[in-house]
Amino acid sequence: DNGGVRANRRKAYIRGFAYPFISKYVLDETLPSLSELTIFSYGFTEEGYLLAPHLDDTFMIEKALSNMTEPILTLTPFDRSGNFSNELISKVVNNQDAIDTLIAQLLNTVKNKGFLGVDIDFEYIKATDRDAFVKFVRQITETMNENGYSVSVDLAPKISADQPGLLYEGKNYGALGQIANSVLVMTYEWGYTYGPPMAVAPINKVRQVLDYAVTEIEPAKINMGIPNYGYDWPLPFVRGTTKAKTIGNVEAVRIAIENNATIEFDETAKSPYFFYEKDGISHEVWFEDPRSIKEKLELIYEYNLRGASYWQIMQLFRSNWLLVDYNFNVEKIKM
C-alpha cells in the first residue's frame, strides 16, 4: 500500500480562482489541495491605476500563505463600474505611460499585500492589439520576475493558429507561452449560459485544444482549465431566449435525487448529464462528477502538463479534491 495515493504519483501545480466573498469554511477545506489561489479580481483605469476588488481580500492572502499556497493577483480589464471592456485593453496596451503606471501599481500592490504572482486574464482582445498585448505581457513579466514574482496568462481554447473569432485573434499563443512563466488554457465553456445543452468541458474538445497548445507552448508551462460547475437548461432550447442556470456539482446530484432522475454518462464527452421535469418544464443538466474529473486529471499525465486551474472554487466539491490529492503531489511554497 502506498499510503492511499497512486503509484508513481507526480508533482503538479493546482490553481483555483476565488472571489473575496468565498466562505471561510470552503477556503479552509480547499487550500490544502491548492498550489496557487488566484484572487478575482483587480481592474484598472485608462491611465493604468489599479482598481482593487470591492471586498477586502486580505484574509484570503493570509489563509493562502498559512497553507503554503501562493496568493495570485488576477488582473482583468474591468473598468470602474466593474464591467469588462476591450476598449480599456486597447487604450492601455497602446499607451506606454499607462503601462508604466499599471506595472508600478501592480508591483506596489503585490509587495504590500503579500501576493506572490500575477495572472493576466484578458479576453476578447482585438486582432489589432495582438502585438501590443504581447509587448504588454513581456513588460509586466520582466518587472515581476526581476522582483521575484511569477506571471501567468489565460488563453482562450484555440484549436489552430489562425482560428477566427474575437476570443482568439488577439492572442498569440506561441509568443505569450514563451514570455509568461505559465499559461492557463481555458478548456471549458463549450456548454455555456446562452448555448445549447452540452458538456461544459467535453474531453474530446479539451483534447483538441491541448493537441494544438502543446505545439505552441511547452507542456511544463500549461495549466489546463477544469470547471467546478454545471448548467441546468430549461427545454426546449431556443437560441437567443433560453438561458441556462449555473449550478454546483454537488447541487446537480441533489437536483437529480430530488426529481428521481437517472444520471447518464456520455462516453464521447466523458461527462455526466440527466433530464428531469419540474412544474411542467423539462430540464437538461450537465455537470462534473468524480468520473469526469478523473478523466480530466489523467490528461495532466498524458500531456505532461504543469497542472490544472479550477474555475472556480466557491462551492466545495470534496470528491474532486480527494481525487487531486490521490493523483498528485500538489506543489507548495518552498520555505
Give short role names for the model-derived ranges.
Residues 4-102:
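Glycan-recognition patch characteristic of GH18 chitinases/ENGases
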Residues 18-33, 95-111, 165-174, 287-301:
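Short, acidic/polar
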Residues 19-21, 42, 76-78, 123-125, ...:
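Active-site beta-loop-alpha junctions enriched in small/polar residues
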Residues 37, 120, 183-185, 224, ...:
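Conserved, mostly hydrophobic/aromatic
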Residues 46-56, 104, 130-256:
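Substrate-binding surface in catalytic domains of secreted glycosidases
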Residues 77-89, 228-296, 326-335:
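Glycan-binding loop/region signatures in secreted carbohydrate-active enzymes
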Residues 79-108, 112, 161-166, 184-188:
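Active-site-adjacent "subsite" loops/lids of carbohydrate-active enzymes
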Residues 296-335:
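Acidic/aromatic/glycine-rich contiguous surface patches that form carbohydrate-binding/processing clefts
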